[in-house]
């Protein structure tokens, strides 16, 4: 058992608070919906980056390489000044949605290099230019560029010329749950000595001011003050009535600059007076402008920075050390010295041991580095998220529980009280949770911290998140938007993970999740199956601009869309709920009724989706699924865009083991009778039941039959259509030469193959589903292929790539797709990483080339990273791909069973993980098309 696993176990079993402190500080609190109190809902311009240094936040804090406690009462982060910038570098800079030619975009270079799941060791790198940061140039140049042009990046400005920058490494090591050692290393990569101001900063989140709602307001204002210390150190005493007393020790007799975390009204709002003589930007004004009156000579406040001023020689480094501890943790009056550095060495060694225990030994050194950085990114992307719907809506005069309210954004979500640590998609570009993203986050998180992954799923199903109607909240810009229903699938995966780790079935977790997911399923059926036909709408369903029309808006034609992806997601939802019901039926036979209910509902969805003729989504001529435009007169038109929408029906595929049928015998018998009475159900999906079982009597629930599976795979595996060098494209390359065009009332609606960024402003313009490669839907395709493989075995083979003459079984196809996805991040034969495209600095400079960014999506033809640069939310799935195919081969998949295919290592390393992807722990079946074995 590794030392880190022991800490995880203590955190779970003994409630030792190893996770109380972590990287829970956002990287952008400004420009968020929570901080928006404008009349028009313009969050980006109501609270800007320029305001952020001077204006206290209401709902959270942000900072550079920062940490906080799990209620974000006390925060620590690093501020920097190079002597040339007009402001301190206290937070990352980026463009707002209207400033960027492809929407909002961070314009900095930073990397999450390492983290253990308890944050006993963490490492972060920020690259800080020595010349003045080109704020104005970045804004002006990007504003001039069209959506058809490349983005203007920080490297393009020339500010890193001659390597005139500092590498700033920030490391944390925990000597105990609330004893945090901090080491900051600044390396001058340039040819000349350069000045650098390092300002490690400690502050309290403002929860005491009069403008904080009374129910969230602290009873007593906390305080920071300078302590008397032995020679050679400086220290700050932090007193908080809830958190307790803490000390920040600073190596060296460095000056301490105190101010208040209060708004500078006089700077921002003409005619308003400051409530305090010392305000949030006081330290900035003291250091940058030399205004010593801006900081408190009484050496106390609610925000403090230790001011280290150094001159770093060319190629040299400087190190500063700090220690943040609760008052009882460090009795030794000399908190630094050799034990300090020894603790860092121990924690790094333990981190190495931990990652070795979860990384397959067959994985290359480069792939292991990618996997570790992906998981570090997942762990660094945790954030404290605070939103009190009742109070927030009161403050906007839009709480429907009160008279005189007016409708506003999220006014129907007044029940919400979110105050938790949540895995973010990207802590700068998307510093708010997204429900369907979060389901995918749990897969890589479960590699390192299954407990935290399970907690994330439980959060979204709590009554203070889940709407009373059963709807899951989407994201703060519009909680009422509709995302794919993937939470039952993630719950099933986490359950199987826990079983594989040797734990007992958590029946309470399964029951709670199942009952809440039933509410969500009912919401879908009641709200998104408009006419009760088992054909679903849903809106944009997370795929932004993939459709001919904006799928969240009324159609220009009138009528409505019958969505192939919405219906496919619901088919998968029924399969997941069926499997969860089987698990529960083993402990409570009442749930066997739910097995029947969800299997039957799947049959009805399959029959509706696979309806023959012009009113069906399946196009027999093309061999593909399309959305149906249902016009007001009842007629239907297929929208023949070859997109991920038409591939998703493939993903509704689940193998059913013999033992699962044995756990629900009455349901199984009843379903066979139902199919006997209604043969049209049997004929509308993959064959099931007697005469259609595979190896070990396994069955298959799938929307597509063998013939349709082959036809879809022909397109999916065609390199001139969906199969790109680096994964499955979101739209077929066919549309590069053959755009889809639809005319309505003299208006042209057009879909082209766009392998890079979007050329429209639809959904903010900062994402694109018309060609690039996206990890989550690729993961669902891989899951489906593995399910089909463990049903068919080696008797079902296809050409891969299409037209190559090379036949592969479906395990080999799944691995081929995974390998292509993983190659985005790996060095090729020329030492270049496709993720960095033509950015030569990242490709050839040894100080850049091994630091990985995990982008939101990837160029459909060359694999270059696009969109958000740190979306080790769902792009962290690459860690799961590396781990999965490092452990799993086709033989093991065929010989194992649904649970035995979850890999367990020796008892010495109990933090071993399932070797399967998603919930696919299925074994194979030997099923010959047209000649399967028959079982009674």
Predicted stretch roles:
Residues 68:
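Active-site-proximal polar cores
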Residues 64:
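Basic, low-complexity intrinsically disordered segments
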Residues 1-54, 72-74, 79-936:
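Acidic, mature catalytic/reactive cores of soluble proteins
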């Amino acid at each position: 058992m590794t030392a880190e696993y022991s800490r995880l176990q203590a955190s779970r079993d003994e409630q030792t608070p190893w996770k109380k402190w972590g990287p829970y500080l956002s990287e952008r609190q400004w420009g968020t919906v929570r901080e928006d109190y404008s009349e028009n809902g313009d969050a980006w311009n109501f609270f800007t980056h320029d305001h952020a240094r001077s204006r206290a936040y209401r709902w959270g804090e942000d900072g550079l390489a920062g940490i906080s406690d799990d209620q974000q009462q006390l925060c620590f982060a690093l501020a920097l000044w190079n002597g040339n910038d007009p402001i301190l570098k206290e937070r990352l800079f980026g463009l707002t949605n209207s400033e960027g030619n492809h929407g909002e975009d961070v314009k900095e270079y930073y990397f999450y290099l390492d983290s253990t799941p308890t944050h006993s060791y963490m490492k972060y790198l920020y690259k800080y230019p020595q010349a003045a940061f080109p704020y104005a140039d970045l804004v002006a140049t990007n504003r001039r560029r069209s959506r058809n042009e490349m983005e203007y990046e920080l490297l393009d400005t020339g500010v890193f010329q001659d390597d005139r920058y500092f590498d700033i490494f920030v490391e944390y090591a925990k000597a105990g749950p609330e004893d945090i050692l901090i080491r900051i290393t600044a390396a001058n990569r340039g040819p000349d000595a350069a000045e650098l101001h390092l300002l490690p900063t400690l502050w309290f989140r403002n929860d005491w001011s009069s403008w904080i709602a009374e129910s969230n307001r602290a009873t007593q204002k906390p305080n920071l003050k300078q302590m008397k210390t032995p020679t050679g150190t400086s220290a700050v005493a932090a007193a908080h009535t809830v958190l307790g007393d803490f000390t920040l020790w600073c190596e060296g007799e460095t000056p301490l600059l105190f101010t208040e975390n209060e708004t500078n009204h006089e700077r921002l709002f003409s005619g308003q007076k400051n409530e305090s003589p010392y305000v949030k930007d006081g330290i900035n004004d003291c250091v940058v402008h030399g205004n010593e009156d801006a900081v408190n000579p009484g050496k106390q406040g609610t925000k403090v920075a230790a001011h280290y001023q150094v001159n770093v020689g060319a190629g040299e480094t400087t190190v500063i050390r700090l220690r943040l501890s609760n008052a009882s943790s460090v009795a030794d009056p000399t908190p630094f010295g050799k034990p300090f550095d020894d603790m860092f060495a121990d924690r790094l060694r333990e981190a190495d041991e931990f990652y070795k225990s979860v990384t397959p030994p067959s994985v290359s050194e480069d792939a292991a580095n990618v996997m570790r950085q992906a998981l570090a990114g997942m762990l660094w992307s945790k954030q404290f998220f605070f939103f009190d719907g009742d109070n927030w809506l009161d403050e906007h005069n839009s709480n429907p529980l009160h008279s005189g309210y007016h409708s506003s954004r999220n006014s129907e979500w007044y029940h919400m009280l979110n105050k938790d640590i949540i895995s973010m998609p990207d802590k700068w570009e998307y510093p708010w949770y997204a429900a369907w993203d979060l389901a995918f986050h749990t897969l890589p998180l479960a590699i390192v911290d299954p407990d935290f992954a399970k907690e994330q799923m439980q959060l979204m199903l709590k009554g203070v998140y889940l709407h009373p109607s059963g709807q899951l909240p989407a994201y703060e810009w519009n909680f009422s938007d509709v995302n794919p229903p993937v939470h039952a699938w993630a719950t099933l995966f986490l359950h199987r993970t826990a079983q594989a780790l040797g734990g007992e079935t958590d029946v309470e977790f399964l029951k709670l999740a199942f009952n809440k997911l039933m509410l969500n399923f009912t919401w879908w059926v009641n709200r998104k199956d408009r006419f009760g036909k088992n054909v679903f709408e849903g809106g944009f369903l997370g795929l932004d601009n993939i459709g001919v029309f904006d799928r969240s808006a009324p159609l220009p034609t009138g009528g409505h869309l019958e969505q192939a992806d919405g219906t496919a997601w619901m088919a998968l939802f029924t399969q997941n709920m069926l499997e969860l019901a089987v698990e529960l039926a083993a402990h409570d036979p009442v749930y066997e009724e739910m097995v029947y209910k969800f299997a039957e509902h799947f049959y009805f969805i399959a029959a509706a989706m696979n309806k023959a003729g012009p009113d069906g989504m399946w196009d027999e001529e093309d061999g593909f699924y399309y959305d149906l435009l249902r016009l007001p007169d009842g007629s239907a038109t297929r929208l023949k865009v070859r997109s991920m929408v038409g591939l998703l029906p493939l993903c509704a595929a689940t193998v059913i083991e013999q033992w699962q049928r044995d756990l629900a015998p009455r349901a199984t018998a009843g379903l066979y009778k139902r199919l006997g009475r209604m043969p049209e159900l049997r004929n509308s999906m993959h064959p099931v039941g007697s005469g259609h079982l595979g190896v070990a009597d396994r069955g298959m629930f799938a929307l597509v039959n063998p013939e349709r599976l082959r036809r879809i795979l022909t397109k999916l595996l065609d390199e001139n259509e969906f199969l790109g060098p680096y994964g499955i494209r979101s739209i077929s390359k066919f549309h590069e030469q053959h755009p889809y065009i639809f005319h309505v009332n003299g208006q042209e609606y057009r879909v082209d193959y766009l392998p890079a960024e979007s050329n429209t402003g639809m959904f903010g313009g900062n994402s694109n589903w018309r060609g690039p490669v996206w990890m989550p839907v690729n993961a669902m395709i891989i899951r489906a292929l593995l399910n089909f493989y463990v049903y068919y075995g080696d008797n079902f083979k296809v050409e891969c790539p299409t037209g190559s003459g090379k036949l592969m079984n479906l395990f080999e196809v799944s691995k081929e797709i995974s390998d292509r996805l993983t190659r985005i991040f790996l060095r090729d034969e020329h030492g270049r990483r496709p993720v960095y495209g033509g950015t030569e600095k990242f490709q050839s400079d040894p100080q850049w080339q091994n630091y990985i960014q995990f982008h939101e999506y990837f160029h459909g033809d060359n694999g270059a990273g696009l969109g958000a640069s740190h979306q080790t939310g769902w792009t962290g799935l690459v860690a799961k791909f590396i781990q999965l195919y490092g452990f799993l081969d086709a033989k093991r998949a065929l010989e194992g069973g649904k649970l035995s295919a979850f890999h367990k290592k020796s008892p010495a390393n109990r933090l071993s993980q399932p070797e399967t992807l998603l919930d696919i722990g299925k074994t194979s079946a030997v099923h010959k098309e047209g000649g399967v074995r028959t079982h009674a």
